[in-house]
């Protein structure tokens, strides 16, 4: 028996390919069901919705999902979407990674005695920042504030409550519209192949309606390919869905971190398991998950049998 409605969760981040798929009536027709799109401010909020059986499908980063799975939330990552979607921006008085030989320690050292904003505890951005704060023993020298609404980070940078922010490419572009700021750490220099988002399905849906997984991933592949191959076209489509951002704004966001694909590549999976180690060491999880706890490969291997496209030519 088919479901009458599928609830799909997505984040506010305008570089995710869901904003293209949200315009496609063919998805509803192909799946022969109503589609309900639900927006969340952070990944941990989406995990809570999965726990409460309010979602069937979700676009989110791997760390909050790992935290949820370890706490018995019944979800599996069935496909990738994008890697290296975390950046750090700051006021222009701070030197960037290019000026400092891509040395993250040197960049962060500039913020001793200052405060940095980052999205919610357990988000991929929070975990990456926590990893480096611990690695360089900056726990008592750099204050970190977590935000449930990531957009507020840029506003607090403008009001001088924060000196910098860690988050999505959207944060960097939004901050530039409000104050004299720039990227101080690019996405490629924070965490190699960091799985900024993947596609998660509730295990109940995978078990009872595996056809939905295959059909959804076919559409996901098309939208992701469009972002990768035709970013200008994608930017126009996304701008039509995201009313708060214009086409040029979206183009700039997409250019900061352009590594899109749906494959679960070796790099994607390896990076995810590195996050498992970091999450365990930092105290976010008590048990180290294994690959099978997180991923279900059988669907994406049918839809995307070719090599991955996360590498930039």
What are these regions (language model features)?
Residues 2-136, 144, 163, 169, ...:
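Short, glycine-/small- and polar/acidic-enriched structural segments
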Residues 30, 135-136, 178, 241, ...:
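Alpha-helical structural context
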Residues 152-240:
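Pocket-lining segment of extracytoplasmic ligand-binding domains
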Residues 209-286:
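Secondary-structure end/capping motifs
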Residues 279-313:
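Conserved C-terminal helix/tail region of periplasmic/extracytoplasmic solute-binding proteins
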């Amino acid at each position: 028996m088919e479901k009458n409605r599928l609830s799909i969760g997505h984040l506010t981040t305008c570089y995710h390919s869901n904003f293209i798929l949200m315009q496609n009536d063919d998805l509803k027709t192909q799946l022969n069901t109503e589609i309900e799109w639900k927006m969340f401010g952070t990944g941990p909020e989406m995990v809570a919705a999965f726990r409460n059986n309010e979602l069937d499908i979700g676009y989110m980063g791997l760390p909050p999902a790992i935290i949820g799975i370890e706490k018995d939330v019944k979800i599996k990552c069935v496909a990738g979407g994008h890697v290296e979607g975390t950046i750090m921006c700051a006021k222009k008085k701070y030197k960037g990674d290019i000026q400092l030989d891509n040395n993250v320690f040197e960049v962060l050292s500039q913020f001793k005695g200052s405060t940095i904003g980052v999205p919610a505890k357990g988000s991929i951005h929070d975990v990456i920042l926590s990893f480096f704060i611990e690695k360089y023993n900056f726990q008592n020298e750099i204050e970190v504030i977590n935000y449930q609404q990531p957009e507020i980070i840029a506003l607090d940078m403008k009001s001088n409550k924060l000196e910098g922010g860690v988050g999505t490419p959207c944060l960097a572009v939004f901050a530039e519209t409000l104050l004299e700021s720039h990227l101080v750490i690019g996405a490629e220099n924070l965490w190699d192949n960091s799985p900024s988002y993947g596609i998660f399905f509730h295990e109940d849906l995978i078990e009872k309606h595996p056809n939905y997984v295959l059909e959804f991933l076919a559409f996901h592949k098309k939208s992701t390919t469009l972002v990768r191959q035709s970013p200008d076209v994608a930017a126009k489509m996304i701008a039509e869905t995201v009313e708060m951002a214009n086409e040029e704004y979206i183009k700039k966001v997409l250019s900061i971190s352009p590594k899109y694909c749906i494959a679960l590549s070796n790099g994607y999976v390896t990076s995810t398991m590195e996050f498992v180690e970091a999450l365990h060491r930092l105290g976010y999880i008590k048990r180290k998950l294994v690959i099978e706890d997180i991923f279900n490969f059988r669907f994406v291997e049918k839809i995307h049998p070719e090599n991955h496209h996360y590498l930039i030519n």
